[in-house]
């Protein structure tokens, strides 16, 4: 597509309204990111979305990677770092699907309650990011989550749930996971 070369590099996700804006092959990621970060493209964003960071997810079984637009702040600092996660483990939800249980310290629990309330009200998502890769971007299904204990459910298999628990536990390591509010809608995050 010569009139819009970006559209030839991005495939529309099968599920509209989710956190993934589009999918692209890993070979095209740098070019897509370059296009999306051009000043003339960034200028087109409404002022409320001025601080947007373009991030990619993990490659799927078809060799495609999800594109996310993550809302940040002027300092590009995440509202929560993985250091607030005191425990995370793979579990199973009420319907016996793989899930991740997570517990935060008291400081993290307070911020988490505010983030989850906002995500619930705005029907947006919360991205879990490690080394600028989005590992999960669940939505909030039942309102603010207080107390810092949460269960992350979604369309992932057992190995993906184990990986996500490991990413959340990585907060104790130098390369900690960041938890960032995103402005899109998708899979679900509920109170355990």
Model-derived regions: residue spans:
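A short acidic/small-residue loop/turn micro-motif
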Residues: 141-145
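A mature extracytoplasmic/lumenal domain signature
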Residues: 104-106, 156, 181
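Short glycine-/polar-rich loops that comprise or flank the Walker A/P-loop
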Residues: 124, 147-148, 173
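Residue-level signal for pocket-adjacent positions within structured domains
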Residues: 135, 147, 184
